[in-house]
From Swiss-Prot:
Pfam families: Maf (PF02545). GO terms for biological process: nucleotide metabolic process. InterPro entries: ITPase-like_fam, Maf-like. Belongs to the Maf family. This is Nucleoside triphosphate pyrophosphatase. HAMAP family: Maf. Transmembrane segments: none annotated. Its EC number is 3.6.1.9. NCBIfam families: maf (TIGR00172). Disulfide bonds: none annotated. It comes from Prochlorococcus marinus (strain MIT 9303). The active site is at residue 68. One of its GO terms (molecular function) is nucleoside triphosphate diphosphatase activity. It catalyses: a ribonucleoside 5'-triphosphate + H2O = a ribonucleoside 5'-phosphate + diphosphate + H(+); a 2'-deoxyribonucleoside 5'-triphosphate + H2O = a 2'-deoxyribonucleoside 5'-phosphate + diphosphate + H(+).
Amino acid sequence: MLMLASASPARHRLLQQALIPHQVMVSGVDEETIHHLDPVRLVQHLAEAKAGVVRQQIEAALPVLGCDSVLEFDGTVFGKPATAVEASSRWQRMAGAWGLLHTGHCLLSVNGERLSETVTTRVLFSALSDSEIEAYVATGEPLLCAGGFALEGQGGLMVERLEGCFSNVIGLSLPLLRRWLLVINE
């Protein structure tokens, strides 16, 4: 059993689908206040902050997992778009191009051990027409996800190819978590 320090329904579903027993507690960490770090350090910092806050709030003897994801596109960090206009603008740029989806992970074990790592997956977005972009943005899905797309949803139709960990793009590297759980359960 572990405690997931995340408000992400996608991460919760990944753990459910992988049959990893867990509970969810939202950390309340304000992700918008930190912008001065490069994308890899940003997601790692936020993952560690989320896990740390939840670790302090719970009394249960559970490992705590914090995660955070952003899309890096042409050197720019794309978190969740704030508006449909912003989502459309991003998709105009991303269509037919590669981006890097970074997910920071931090697992705090019961005995105080801290495991931290960022996993990066290359994402090739499909070449899209303006009407395809408008239709996707109109679903509202892009406003809910880092990078403005959900691989496990309709956004999966807009992704041509991945290089790296599939589940990482959804918000959590399951292979990394498996390795970590083996380490802390030894």
